[in-house]
């Protein structure tokens, strides 16, 4: 299936149903009073993370999602039916962004996690709500409010423990094929890898980690050169980055310059990503003598000002790969992911249900007061009849 990691969709929540103006009519009850019911609430639009999905390709074709409108109120104090909700399933790792404000609405990082992206409209009030001692036959009602409408940008970011960086043909795909069951395409030309891929590295029956391979970067990627930096976002959730360097490039380029290009592109994309733990890994050492490879790796590390430990491996022959993987596993165990507890704060809304309906009732009451006739005269027949019956 084609890998798609970005999609734009429109979500529209259902409008609230309108209130009803109705009066009770039964035999021998000529004036039964108001019995108009309230409308129903509009349906909501939800996002739900599903671990069985791995691409956003479905939302390249289906771009609009609309929840059901609430039904209008009816006579006999019947409340309208609430509109049905709409649930949009997305892969785990999807980030939801409101294109109108640029605000990140949420990150879908757990299977079954749900996120409200569009709230349905509130129901309108029927005329039963407006009856009072001075208004026995109210003909007022309120309409339901419109539901939320948003244009959303969905960004899929892979969930991996380890991310791989490097120039094209640095051996990233060969490495992931050597340590996992993933089989990305491998060839002797640049940009063989066109989309990110994941591989699970199993060290034993209990220990494993996930590694992500992204297309190679070249100079000017931040400005859109090559495949650009659009795939770097898949490394934002990684705990450690493996920077693969071809120790003896076949095209004759300088390994030091190549390494600096990767570092520069990381810093241009995100300072947070550039600050992540990054390990230097020299690949293709099988093409050189052991002493020559060690000497060259030391010279490159010194030129880069690298003072930490570095690794010499051959992804093709497996030399040094197992030791590197065990060190990565140890690092992951010693640096577990810290789950920040979400602060339990009240839901941020513009106004609450009770406030809205109370305001509607107060406005109607003010209108009734303005229209009230303080001077009683013979034309007020309804008032005379009412007083007589009491």
UniProtKB/Swiss-Prot annotation:
Domain of life the protein comes from: Bacteria
InterPro entries according to UniProt: G_OBG, GTP-bd, GTP-bd_Obg/CgtA, GTP1-OBG_CS, GTP1_OBG_dom, GTP1_OBG_dom_sf, OBG_GTPase, P-loop_NTPase
Segments of skewed composition (Polar residues): 129-145
Compartments, record wording: Cytoplasm
Any Pfam family hit: GTP1_OBG
Domain OBG-type G: from-to ranges: 160-333
Any GO molecular function: GTP binding
Transmembrane parts of this sequence: none
CC terms in the record's Gene Ontology section: cytoplasm
Binding site for GTP: 166-173, 191-195, 213-216, 283-286, 314-316
Obligatory cofactor(s): Mg(2+)
Enzyme Commission number(s) from the entry: 3.6.5.-
Entry's family note: Belongs to the TRAFAC class OBG-HflX-like GTPase superfamily. OBG GTPase family.
Quaternary structure and interacting proteins, as annotated: Monomer.
Function as written in the Swiss-Prot or TrEMBL entry: An essential GTPase which binds GTP, GDP and possibly (p)ppGpp with moderate affinity, with high nucleotide exchange rates and a fairly low GTP hydrolysis rate. Plays a role in control of the cell cycle, stress response, ribosome biogenesis and in those bacteria that undergo differentiation, in morphogenesis control.
Family annotation (NCBIfam families): Obg_CgtA, PRK12297.1, PRK12299.1
Stated name of the protein: GTPase Obg
């Amino acid at each position: 299936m084609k890998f798609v990691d970005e999609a734009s969709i429109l979500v529209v929540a259902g409008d609230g149903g309108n209130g009803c103006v109705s009066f009770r009519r039964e035999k021998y009850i000529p004036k039964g009073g108001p019995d108009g019911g309230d409308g129903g609430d509009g349906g909501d639009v939800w996002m739900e993370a599903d671990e069985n999905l791995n691409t956003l390709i479905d939302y390249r074709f289906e771009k609009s999602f609309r929840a059901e409108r609430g039904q209008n109120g009816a006579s006999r104090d019947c409340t309208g039916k609430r509109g049905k909700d709409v649930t949009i399933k997305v892969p785990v790792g999807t980030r939801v962004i409101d294109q109108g404000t640029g605000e990140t609405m949420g990150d879908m990082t757990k299977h079954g996690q749900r996120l409200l992206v569009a709230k349905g409209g509130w129901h309108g009030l029927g005329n039963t709500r407006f009856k009072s001692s001075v208004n026995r036959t109210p003909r007022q009602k309120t309409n339901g409010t419109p539901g939320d409408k948003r244009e959303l940008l969905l960004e899929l970011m892979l969930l991996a423990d380890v991310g791989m960086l490097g120039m094209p043909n640095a051996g990233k795909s060969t490495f992931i094929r050597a340590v996992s069951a993933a089989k990305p395409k491998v060839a002797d030309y640049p940009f063989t890898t066109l989309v990110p891929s994941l591989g699970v590295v199993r060290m034993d029956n209990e220990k494993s980690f996930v590694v992500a391979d992204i297309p190679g970067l070249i100079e000017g990627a931040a400005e859109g050169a090559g495949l650009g930096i659009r795939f770097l976002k898949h490394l934002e959730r990684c705990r450690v980055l493996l920077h693969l360097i071809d120790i003896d490039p076949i095209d004759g380029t300088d390994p030091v310059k190549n390494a600096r290009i990767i570092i520069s592109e990381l810093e241009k994309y995100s300072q947070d990503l550039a600050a992540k733990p990054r390990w230097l890994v020299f690949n293709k050492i099988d093409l050189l003598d052991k002493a020559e490879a060690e000497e060259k790796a030391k010279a490159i590390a010194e030129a880069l000002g690298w003072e930490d430990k570095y690794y010499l491996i051959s992804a093709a022959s497996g030399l040094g790969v197992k030791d590197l993987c065990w060190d990565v596993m140890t690092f992951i165990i010693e640096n577990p992911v810290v789950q920040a507890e979400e602060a339990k704060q009240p839901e941020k809304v513009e106004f609450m249900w009770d406030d809205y309906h109370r305001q509607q009732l107060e406005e109607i009451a003010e209108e009734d007061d303005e229209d009230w006739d303080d001077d009683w005269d013979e034309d007020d027949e309804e008032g005379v009849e009412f007083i007589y019956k009491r």
